[in-house]
Amino acid sequence: MKNKGAKQKLKRKGAASAFGCDLTEYLESSGQDVPYVLKSCAEFIETHGIVDGIYRLSGVTSNIQRLRQEFGSDQCPDLTREVYLQDIHCVGSLCKLYFRELPNPLLTYELYEKFTEAVSHCPEEGQLARIQNVIQELPPSHYRTLEYLIRHLAHIASFSSKTNMHARNLALVWAPNLLRSKEIEATGCNGDAAFLAVRVQQVVIEFILNHVDQIFNNGAPGSLENDENRPIMKSLTLPALSLPMKLVSLEEAQARSLATNHPARKERRENSLPEIVPPMGTLFHTVLELPDNKRKLSSKSKKWKSIFNLGRSGSDSKSKLSRNGSVFVRGQRLSVEKATIRPAKSMDSLCSVPVEGKETKGNFNRTVTTGGFFIPATKMHSTGTGSSCDLTKQEGEWGQEGMPPGAEGGFDVSSDRSHLQGAQARPPPEQLKVFRPVEDPESEQTAPKMLGMFYTSNDSPSKSVFTSSLFQMEPSPRNQRKALNISEPFAVSVPLRVSAVISTNSTPCRTPPKELQSLSSLEEFSFHGSESGGWPEEEKPLGAETSAASVPKKAGLEDAKAVPEAPGTVECSKGLSQEPGAHLEEKKTPESSLSSQHLNELEKRPNPEKVVEEGREAGEMESSTLQESPRARAEAVLLHEMDEDDLANALIWPEIQQELKIIESEEELSSLPPPALKTSPIQPILESSLGPFIPSEPPGSLPCGSFPAPVSTPLEVWTRDPANQSTQGASTAASREKPEPEQGLHPDLASLAPLEIVPFEKASPQATVEVGGPGNLSPPLPPAPPPPTPLEESTPVLLSKGGPEREDSSRKLRTDLYIDQLKSQDSPEISSLCQGEEATPRHSDKQNSKNAASEGKGCGFPSPTREVEIVSQEEEDVTHSVQEPSDCDEDDTVTDIAQHGLEMVEPWEEPQWVTSPLHSPTLKDAHKAQVQGLQGHQLEKRLSHRPSLRQSHSLDSKPTVKSQWTLEVPSSSSCANLETERNSDPLQPQAPRREITGWDEKALRSFREFSGLKGAEAPPNQKGPSGVQPNPAETSPISLAEGKELGTHLGHSSPQIRQGGVPGPESSKESSPSVQDSTSPGEHPAKLQLKSTECGPPKGKNRPSSLNLDPAIPIADLFWFENVASFSSPGMQVSEPGDPKVTWMTSSYCKADPWRVYSQDPQDLDIVAHALTGRRNSAPVSVSAVRTSFMVKMCQARAVPVIPPKIQYTQIPQPLPSQSSGENGVQPLERSQEGPSSTSGTTQKPAKDDSPSSLESSKEEKPKQDPGAIKSSPVDATAPCMCEGPTLSPEPGSSNLLSTQDAVVQCRKRMSETEPSGDNLLSSKLERPSGGSKPFHRSRPGRPQSLILFSPPFPIMDHLPPSSTVTDSKVLLSPIRSPTQTVSPGLLCGELAENTWVTPEGVTLRNKMTIPKNGQRLETSTSCFYQPQRRSVILDGRSGRQIE
């Protein structure tokens, strides 16, 4: 106070120098330590200002002006006057005004970049040290003032219970007054950039507020200034004591600053300027990039400024949502190109962080800094992608994700993960970033899947759309934006705080625990929502873990799955992204190791490590084989690193990155990108798939998320596998560990029934089946790449070991392996899907179809060689990307091997068996079928995932596999749905495949877990509501049954199954019987035996049998299927995998017979496959499958309600019998029949077939849908989950439903319109009218209103529309898609599912869905828009945000 007089005099002389006067000069002249305005206001507020909203609410302007004048005059205002006591907020406003008017902000311009950079570092300790160092660089006067102010604010924050102004809120209102960026001010970006900047600034201030004691506890201004600062402070203070001194001080200050003679002056000046300047140089060296980016941002901001400024600059809340919708979308379009988006993400992160509970400022900061303004390097690295780069760098996997575009090889922006990033850095990473920050490590881990779901489902649809549109049209962020608008925003916001708002998130959130898990997944990952369907059952027990655990679980699942599948995943990853292929490989290599390790760990737990080891060997061998690209390895390493560090983030981001990558890969896809695409889509798919379904995870984990998911997977597997094994492990570990923890997990698994059911019910069988299924798949892969001796050797070893042992330990191992394979399969599938997706964008039609087929076969194709598979896949898919082959093969091979290239030995030797029947539609399909025959196991293992996807793409090629998986998906509607979402996530084309894969995987897993469920449900699936499960049941049962029954001859059986799986019809049929058997355990065994017997012959030559099993057997199988369908009534309920109840039912069913049924199934599957081959050719089945899928999906949520709907599809009932009676005769029926059981497969098949005969499929889809609707209705519910997933993959939930139909329709359509698929994002909206038109027409004729109504209610549609511009394309198949969507939403959101499950008829559910959906989710509005979206696809496409 002794300075008071001096200050007043000073004021007199300086005339109101307090306001707008340089702080240092003012304090020197006034001789005060801190500004009098601050001191008096702070003291007054601490005494009288502990009121609600202090510092947030503004005082009366006249009072503020009066106070300012008084402070400017000699008199020190008496703040205790009544006028001020009544308007306390004017004092707080004045205090903020003072700092706002400082010429140089309190945290100076020079240090702005340093501050933002400091908080961008992940570890809090690192942040603290950095912030401390930067604060020490502040001029002493600024330092003292900051310390005083921060301590005051921290004190006020302690009264947050009264004021509601906690540290974050205070930081938010104070940050703009304390931190200002010259660049932003100079650019005059008041909108987007400024708003984003506020987010970053808030993080800085909040961090300081939360660490005030640590930061200011040195007692001295700074360590550097510590010694001299005090003297400096004294010298400042002393000179200030006297006016003369003060005056001299001012002059001295200038003179000294020039001469820097005065130690104090020198020190102070040095700190404020010299030191700051050098730091500035350093800072700007780093920051210069940022500024550069910012400038870009600014310039772009200027362009967008009007948009941002419209409602952006001032609307924080809007900004958050907008960020999701508008900023984010803009960010996506621009974000890739402008740093602003990053900030948007940062803001989102900030927003999200609160949701996350501000988990880690590091994380948030990282996001903000890396994602926000701190993207200098990243942004610099890639204009739009740069943002993602930084995040990547920080998150460690952003690089991977961000790199995908052109950074494939050289995007080393993030030097840390730059090589990875280079390959995967992508614009979407921004989203990812936002998401990631939102998700945080744990969440993020799942988030990647969720992202895959949101990003993939939403984003994935958007990415699918992205992958399609973006992939194909990747260059234009517009497409991205378009997809992003709807899906991206969801992806971004949805993760946490918006998740509730966002329909997918909302719905899942609202959804019951099972759905909650889904939600958590959804929340974190759209796909999670998708996965939620599967998860609820699988993960339901972990309801508590839903959000965090769900994500972790998901991650864990992912881990478990990824780990078990790690080799597969790695392989898949590798195969998945060739461009990322290298990355995948790299990832695969480490991941392979990691995966193997985890697998070992996981499988070790579940079973002998040897299988895992074998798998790992195979995986590693494959890894080696697949390590075609060092980058893959590097990525793998990075993945590994990420695994440890950013596993969660990596998981989330990589998927997004991969999605991003996919996007770009798709563009590059033709040659290299296909794998990248594959990776990308796969990641979304994988993640999404993973998220949605455990198998989903492999896709997320494997292909795209290969590194993320796998990394996450391994990590999570380790952490979650044991801990979350019940949840995640339940799914993954359960599947994997199931053998071991099966019983233990089973209770959980009961809830996790889908997953556990199989393991529990068939701990051994499941393991066997899983191993078998996966093994079969896996072997097919090794056979596919017989040349790759490692693979082959690994496979044989695995087979050898797996064969006999597999049955027992292999059962567990198999479970693990299967899961691994599931993962792997899914991965491969996803890989395939991704590949297909990549190809899809590139060769939308051909690739989708062929990629699917190729991939499906590719999995099988690897028989000749990975190249073969790839060739088949890529050739067909992408004309032949060596990378694809590598990718596909890698995926397949590695996956298979990782999955224990089991059984591949036998099937491998029977390549001839794997004839076209499996993929009869295409030579490639045939070839693949052969390969699959050989690789039946691998394929079954791998193909089960990949083939599903593949079939999705090449409807012919892998309908069955898809069917299988689909069945599995139906098994857990949630799973299916989730998977569908996951599938839908990657891309529409890929979506079909991927979704199917995801679904398949999910289905498979679910199925395995649900084996009974599936068995029980599969019949229902076939029958109707249960039909959903039948498909999975069909697939899974076959796989499982095969695995179980064929545990010994898993190699054959699995191949058959897979083969069957590959041929959707066969799978369906087989599944049908399986389902039947499952449904009635007694019958099931008998049937199983029958089937087994039927399958028995083919078992040795499962593939050949299935290939050769012509309509005759397929018909019989169909009859079996029909019977199963009949049985499916009970199973139907089981079929409600989404519901724990169903899961449990399935569980019981599954526990004994499902596997047997599966055993039977393999043959049946083969038969079906054979029949399916023809049927695959018929699009109608696909349509039916789609429709059915849609229904089934609906049914899944409410299996029972679905049955009546099945009747609603009375048109279909006829086909049902027909299908039943003459599956081979009525391939369409078969398809239809399969529609229920093979709906997924069918749908996927149609999806694949669709690509060749997109229109045909579309046309037939409708007719088929009618037949399929009834029979396939339930199944189709599944199929839709799967198919829709693939087709609608863009739309996670809706996508699933739609995906099935759309997948079938759109998938076919996509197959044919695969390019549009790539384009579909944009095109999809347009295509939705066109391509969707046909499905729409079909739907309309079938149940126009029903379907239409359905779609609006489904948030999935929302998800899908936003993220599925591509899906929108599918949405074009609005009617079908709608139903699919309905299913998907059901799956996605248990709540919706419940509401929607009735939808199987398509009407009831839809009506329910519509209302609940609207009420349930914000997306509902989008869903409501959905119909319009379908119609106004363009609207959605051009402004994806519009739907929002």
Swiss-Prot record:
SUPFAM superfamilies listed in its UniProt record: GTPase activation domain, GAP (SSF48350)
Modified residues (Phosphothreonine): 286, 679, 789
Pfam families for this protein: RhoGAP
GO BP: regulation of small GTPase mediated signal transduction; small GTPase-mediated signal transduction
Cell compartment(s), UniProt: Cell projection, Lamellipodium; Cell junction, Focal adhesion
Gene3D superfamilies in the record: Rho GTPase activation protein
Main location: other
UniProt-recorded Gene Ontology molecular function terms: GTPase activator activity; SH3 domain binding
Biased composition (Basic and acidic residues): 600-619, 735-745, 803-817, 839-848, 992-1008, 1246-1265
Biased composition regions of type Polar residues, renumbered to the chain: 722-734, 822-834, 960-977, 1028-1038, 1211-1224, 1234-1245, 1292-1303, 1314-1323
PANTHER family per record: CDC42 GTPASE-ACTIVATING PROTEIN (PTHR15729), RHO GTPASE-ACTIVATING PROTEIN 31 (PTHR15729:SF3)
Subunit annotation: Interacts with ITSN1, which inhibits GAP activity. Interacts with PARVA. Interacts with GTP-loaded RHOU.
Protein purpose: Functions as a GTPase-activating protein (GAP) for RAC1 and CDC42. Required for cell spreading, polarized lamellipodia formation and cell migration.
Involvement in disease: Adams-Oliver syndrome 1: A disorder characterized by the congenital absence of skin (aplasia cutis congenita) in combination with transverse limb defects. Aplasia cutis congenita can be located anywhere on the body, but in the vast majority of the cases, it is present on the posterior parietal region where it is often associated with an underlying defect of the parietal bones. Limb abnormalities are typically limb truncation defects affecting the distal phalanges or entire digits (true ectrodactyly). Only rarely, metatarsals/metacarpals or more proximal limb structures are also affected.
Record protein name field: Rho GTPase-activating protein 31
Organism, as annotated: Homo sapiens
This protein's encoding gene: ARHGAP31
